[in-house]
Amino acid sequence: MAVAYADKPNHFINFPLTQFQGFVLNYKGLQFQLLDEGVDCKIQTAPHISLAMLDIQPEDYRSVDVAIQEVIDDMHWGEGFQIKFENPHILGRCIVLDVKGVEELHDDLVNYIRDKGCVADQSRKWIGHCTIAQLTDAALSIKENVDFINSMQFNYKITINPSSPARLEIVKLGAEKKDGFYETIASHWMGIRFEYNPPTDKLAMIMGYCCSEVVRKELEEGDLPENDDDAWFKLSYHYENNSWFFRHVYRKSSYFRKSCQNLDCNCLGFYESSVEED
């Protein structure tokens, strides 16, 4: 079966960098050097890594959103991983940094998104990079500018672990920027699954069948099957695997949160005030 490519992309998977203050301080230092040298360019105000280009429609957002969360769930953190930024150079009309350390994350995102039936990645080889600025045509033709850019030095590492402020986002091409970030369609903290550890090995130990109706009322329409047996299986299966659906239910259902936290349910005597947040 032929692979469809996002050679005319309209969205991308974004890894924002503005929240990494040490990196941004050094990144802005590079931009200041360019401006101080008089290089005619447009400075990038939202530093980021484009991890995958997408050709999707609004009806695909949910599928891509789920794929991102599944990638996060299946990550094997160990002691984390490092992202390395180095070698300022010209790529097309842009001044960029080489980015190393996210190749596996790129591959996982592309594979998981394609598994959902959505179009991801381009036919040309993906090159990890971080854009510093975009040159004007006039600036690109000046040899002194090119020589100066090639002489610039940069070497910085960011360690990513479950407590890092790392995020994966769906962004539409041309999206507005504010305070160093793109306007997003969806944004997920990469360490989010470590917030919610299952309190027991079996959901059945703390909840009963009648809980499914209470939980269903607090979720989005269609999240849980109408059949109670099917709904229970979906809750139990995903709960045991601590995957994206558990996190979704945990966030959306205050009753589910209280039951998990208390290792007990109160569905027969359920009333709204019994699940108020502390």
Swiss-Prot record:
InterPro entries in alphabetical order: Coronavirus_NS2A, NS2A-like
Taxonomic superkingdom: Viruses
Entries under Pfam families matching the protein: Corona_NS2A
Similarity section: Belongs to the coronaviruses ns2a protein family.
Protein name: Non-structural protein 2a
Source lineage: Viruses, Riboviria, Orthornavirae, Pisuviricota, Pisoniviricetes
